[in-house]
From Swiss-Prot:
Annotated localization: Nucleus
DNA-binding stretch(es), residue numbering of this chain: 162-226, 325-390
Comp. bias regions, Polar residues: 419-429
Pfam family, one: WRKY
Record flagged with keyword Metal-binding: yes
Residue span of region Disordered: 1-45, 140-166, 284-317, 410-439
Name listed for the protein in its UniProt record: Probable WRKY transcription factor 32
Species this chain originates from: Arabidopsis thaliana (Mouse-ear cress)
UniProt similarity note: Belongs to the WRKY group I family.
């Protein structure tokens, strides 16, 4: 009996427990059902907002792309939810126009234009103010034809650069300079003729884009144009149209401007006579040179050679003096300033360079130790002093008489190249050869050279001519 009562109690306990669990399961399932229904409501609300937005976009696309305004009825609908109250403007559009709008949107050319349009956002209004939304004015979107008529038409032009090099005139030119010009803005290129001893030059003026605007010829060619196997017709016209620079023998230089864009054939007839006259004048001068007598031409040639030898400023007199090593820098009576030093091949001792301190005096000298005798020095003078010997300073002492006599030819304006050897021995034989050389020095250098030679002879030195 006790066992039966225990089983009954257990059954009642399980029944009570199951009754308690069933309400809990029912509450959980009900909560899940509510969540599902709420999610479905949210999805429906989202789908409705997406459809309304697509409808507005289609309305605006149809208004933009259609040439005739469609019959569109704007309906104001108020959708109220538990949390948000929204007012959405939707439009009723025919199906064929929507399909046409979809085809237009797929074209890439109109996709960029549709991106620039602004979409009017939805207005959140209260139910009391919802009636005022019907009074909002509709914004008219311009049609495609109006946009085409209002937009400016841009023509893209391709600029073809003109070649910088102008037509050849038959001569060979070498460029030697270029500079920028402000007025007119551009650049100038400078050329000279490559022919030897030809002074002809030309200037090419170019604009900003590099096109040659004009050519300025300076000087006259002293030769014929170099021969070529073939010429283009344009080169022949330009060569014929160049105006001769000098009209007569007295004119040295003249400018002639030839615009690069102009046709030179118009001025060819005017210049043919002048160029022919120039050729005749050249031939006449050549004939006169051929008919000139031989002695007269020889005399002119000698005079030109002598004038060339006198007019050469780069050549300087050169005197080489061998003296003892104890001779000072200012031992010749002049004042010197050292301006350089360098090593010479074959001599372990450096060579020192000096210039005369007198203003405007071109005389230079360099002193180096002799290779065979380290106690002797070799002094080389270049140039002639154009001033008197300065008064010696006390600190330098009196100048050496032997060195002064040896450097005496540098104090006169002569152009003879002599070499004076001053041996270290005090006794030398003076014979007929020294007397003959002294007479030659008298003829070339004058009385002062003779006096210096007599001084050297009196102290026992020998002068040798190179």
């Amino acid at each position: 009996m006790e066992e039966d009562t225990g089983i009954d109690e257990a059954k009642t306990y399980t029944v009570e427990k199951s009754e308690k669990v069933e309400p809990e399961k029912d509450g959980l399932s009900q909560f899940r059902d509510e969540e599902k229904s709420l999610g479905a409501d949210m999805e429906d609300l989202h789908d409705e907002t997406v459809r309304e937005t697509l409808g507005k976009d289609q309305v605006q696309g149809v208004r933009e792309n259609s040439s005739v305004e469609p019959n569109v009825e704007d309906v104001l609908e108020v959708n109220e939810t538990d949390s948000v109250k929204e007012t959405v403007v939707s439009a009723i559009v025919p199906v064929d126009e929507v399909e046409e709008n979809r085809q237009v949107e797929t074209s890439p050319s109109l996709a960029a234009s549709s991106d620039s349009l602004t979409v009017t956002p939805c207005l959140s209004l209260d139910p009391a103010t919802a009636s005022t939304a019907q009074d909002l004015p509709l914004v008219s979107v311009p049609t495609k034809q109006e946009q085409r008529s209002d937009s400016p038409v841009v023509n893209r032009l391709s600029v073809t650069p003109v070649p910088r090099t102008p037509a050849r005139d038959g001569y060979n030119w070498r460029k030697y300079g270029q500079k920028q010009v402000k007025s007119p803005k551009g650049s100038r290129s400078y050329y000279r003729c490559t022919y030897t001893e030809c002074c002809a030059k030309k200037i090419e003026c170019s604009n900003d884009s590099g096109n040659v605007v004009e050519i300025v010829n300076k000087g006259l060619h002293t030769h014929e144009p170099p021969r070529k196997t073939s010429f283009s017709p344009r080169e022949i016209r330009v060569t014929t149209a160049i105006r001769p620079v000098s009209e007569d023998d007295t004119v040295v230089e003249e400018l002639s401007i030839v615009p690069s864009g102009s046709d030179p054939s118009a001025s060819t007839k005017e210049y043919i006579c002048e160029s022919q006259t120039l050729v005749d004048r050249k031939r006449h001068c050549e004939n006169e040179a051929v008919e000139e007598p031989e002695p007269k031409r020889r005399l002119k040639k000698d005079n030109s050679q002598s004038s060339d030898s006198v007019s050469k400023p780069g050549k300087k007199n050169k005197f080489v003096v061998h003296a003892a090593g104890d001779v000072g820098i200012c031992g010749d009576g002049y004042r010197w300033r050292k301006y350089g030093q360098k090593m010479v091949k074959g001599n372990p001792h450096p060579r020192n360079y000096y210039r005369c301190t007198s203003a405007g005096c071109p005389v230079r000298k360099h002193i180096e130790t002799a290779v065979e005798n380290t106690k002797a020095v070799i002094i080389t003078y270049k140039g002639v002093h154009n001033h008197d010997m300065p008064v010696p300073k006390k600190r330098h002492g009196p100048p050496s008489s032997m060195l002064v006599a040896a450097a005496a030819p540098t104090s006169m304006r002569t152009r003879t190249d002599d070499q004076v050897n001053i041996p270290t021995s005090s006794q030398c034989s003076v014979g007929r050869e020294s007397e003959k050389q002294s007479k030659e020095a008298l003829d070339v250098g004058g009385e002062k050279v003779m006096e210096s030679a007599r001084t050297l002879l009196s102290i026992g030195f020998e002068i040798k001519q190179c």
